[in-house]
């Protein structure tokens, strides 16, 4: 036995499974301004004390492993470990509690959402001592926020680029989402833009399939944009989906969009991945492209109430990674969305500073300092009769994204777009005149119908 090993054996430690609470449960800890704070909804296995599971979450998502190891002595665990500093019951749930965990900033790579999520949620969700685990919210400290570029441009710069103020923007997803040829697809884009929409959109799963290769789609959509701009005198755009199987192909598509001179591209940020998304966001800022973000796959992560991750966390991550728009639910329409909770993460996307407000699901005060805001997109299952509610709920800094609510008009695509635009302008005008959109919305739309298809 070497002298070094002999010395260690003489002053060694007891091997075996550790009790995490001896190290990672620290209710006396006072959080620092530089800590990343997390709120986890924990559903433990029966008979397991909350403290034991709370500290296990802190351990498994930071420096902990199931036993003491020799190399623990080569670093400072007190400096690097996560700490479960508070536990509270979930009202109305006997077997659940919220565990608050603080992580030292040195655990995370600067400017990397990928690394942040790998650390905080990458492993602990499979922990067998837990029946379920959900990340409800994160507090991102200013020191970490400042390491991110964030959205390529932000709300005000986008409005200046488009020269459109004082109202929500209007969009439409081209349908059917799959099966159209590039030429027919471009025709639908033109008809919608010519009818009065600001944007049209590739559906999230339109990439480069045999029936419509990406380059052909980009060319026909660019033609539709320029033709509609010439005829309306307004700046138009189409969300050209740059999502691809490799980052190299994604960037090739973004470069071609820039060469065509179009104003905006699109990315599926969850299926594409945060590293790809941040790369694309940096390119978009450097090259004057707006970036529309689709959240395809989000419900796999956020729909279950007890397990996964709340969308407000994904929304914060997107603001850090970069995107000028993101789909954010509707409150009305065909997708789920509670009004107060939805408006909570809408404010997290748009505002510079958001106070803690548990009634809206906001567990921590969040200061975004100089990080630009993201425009929330209301989409899926909406139509002109929803316009008063959408205008009231989302306000001006939003995109109201129709699909069947435009293309389903019995007279065709262009009349559907006209109906959308007339309804929006009627609601904005009524709101500015002091009318109550919630009470008078139906009447306002019926009045507008007299002057619209």
Curated annotation (Swiss-Prot):
It is found in: Plastid, Chloroplast. The keyword Chloroplast applies. The record marks 334 as: Transition state stabilizer. The modification N6,N6,N6-trimethyllysine is found at residue 14. Mg(2+) binds at residues 201, 203-204. The modification N-acetylproline is found at residue 3. Gene3D superfamilies: Ribulose bisphosphate carboxylase, large subunit, C-terminal domain, RuBisCO large subunit, N-terminal domain. The active site is at residues 175, 294. It is an enzyme of class 4 (lyase). The gene is rbcL. CDD domains: RuBisCO_large_I. The basic functional RuBisCO is composed of a large chain homodimer in a 'head-to-tail' conformation. In form I RuBisCO this homodimer is arranged in a barrel-like tetramer with the small subunits forming a tetrameric 'cap' on each end of the 'barrel'. Belongs to the RuBisCO large chain family. Type I subfamily. Keywords: Acetylation, Calvin cycle, Carbon dioxide fixation, Chloroplast, Disulfide bond, Lyase, Magnesium, Metal-binding, Methylation, Monooxygenase, Oxidoreductase, Photorespiration, Photosynthesis, Plastid. Binds 1 Mg(2+) ion per subunit. Its cofactor is Mg(2+). It comes from the Eukaryota. GO terms for biological process: photorespiration; reductive pentose-phosphate cycle. The disulfide bond which can form in the large chain dimeric partners within the hexadecamer appears to be associated with oxidative stress and protein turnover. Residues 1-2 form a propeptide. It comes from Phuopsis stylosa (Caucasian crosswort). PROSITE patterns: RUBISCO_LARGE. This is Ribulose bisphosphate carboxylase large chain. The keyword ATP-binding does not apply. SUPFAM superfamilies: RuBisCo, C-terminal domain, RuBisCO, large subunit, small (N-terminal) domain. Substrate binds at residues 123, 173, 177, 295, 327, 379. HAMAP family: RuBisCO_L_type1. The modification N6-carboxylysine is found at residue 201.
């Amino acid at each position: 036995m070497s002298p070094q090993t002999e010395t260690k054996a003489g002053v060694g430690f007891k091997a075996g499974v550790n009790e995490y609470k001896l190290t990672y449960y620290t209710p006396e800890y006072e959080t620092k301004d530089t800590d990343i704070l997390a709120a986890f909804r924990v559903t433990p296995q029966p008979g397991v004390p909350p403290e034991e599971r709370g500290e296990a979450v802190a351990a498994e998502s930071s420096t902990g492993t199931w036993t003491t190891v020799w190399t623990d002595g080569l670093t400072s665990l007190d400096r690097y470990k996560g700490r479960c500093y508070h536990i509270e019951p979930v009202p109305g749930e006997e077997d659940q509690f919220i565990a608050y965990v603080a992580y030292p900033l040195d655990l995370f790579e600067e400017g990397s959402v990928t690394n942040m999520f790998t650390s905080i949620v990458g492993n602990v969700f499979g922990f067998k001592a837990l029946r379920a685990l959900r990340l409800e919210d994160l507090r991102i400290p200013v020191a970490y926020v400042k390491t991110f570029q964030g959205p390529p441009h932000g709300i005000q710069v986008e409005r200046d680029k488009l020269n459109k103020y004082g109202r929500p923007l209007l969009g439409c997803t081209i349908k059917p989402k799959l099966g159209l040829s590039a030429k027919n697809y471009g025709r639908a884009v033109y008809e919608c833009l010519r009818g009065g929409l600001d944007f049209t959109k590739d559906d999230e799963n339109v990439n480069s399939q045999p029936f419509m290769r990406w380059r052909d789609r980009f060319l026909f959509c660019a033609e539709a944009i320029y033709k509609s701009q010439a005829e309306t005198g307004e700046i138009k755009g189409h969300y050209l989906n740059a999502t691809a199987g490799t980052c190299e192909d994604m960037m090739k598509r973004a470069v071609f969009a820039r060469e065509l001179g179009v104003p905006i591209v699109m990315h599926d940020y969850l299926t594409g991945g945060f590293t790809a998304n941040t790369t694309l966001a940096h390119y978009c800022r450097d090259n004057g492209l707006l970036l529309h973000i689709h959240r395809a796959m989000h419900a796999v992560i956020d729909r279950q109430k007890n397990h996964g991750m709340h969308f407000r966390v994904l929304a914060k991550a997107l603001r850090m990674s970069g995107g000028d728009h993101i789909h954010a639910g509707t409150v009305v329409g065909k997708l789920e969305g509670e009004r107060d909770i939805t408006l909570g993460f809408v404010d997290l996307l748009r505002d510079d500073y958001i106070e803690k407000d548990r009634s809206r699901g906001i567990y921590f005060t969040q200061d975004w300092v100089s990080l630009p805001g993201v425009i929330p997109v209301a989409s899926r299952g909406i139509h002109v009769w929803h316009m008063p509610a959408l205008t009231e709920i989302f306000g001006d800094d939003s995109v109201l994204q129709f699909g069947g609510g435009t293309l389903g008009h019995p007279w065709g695509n262009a009349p559907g777009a006209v109906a959308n635009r007339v309804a929006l302008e009627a609601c904005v005008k009524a709101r500015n005149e002091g009318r109550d959109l919630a009470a008078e919305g139906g009447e306002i739309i019926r009045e507008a119908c007299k002057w619209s298809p």
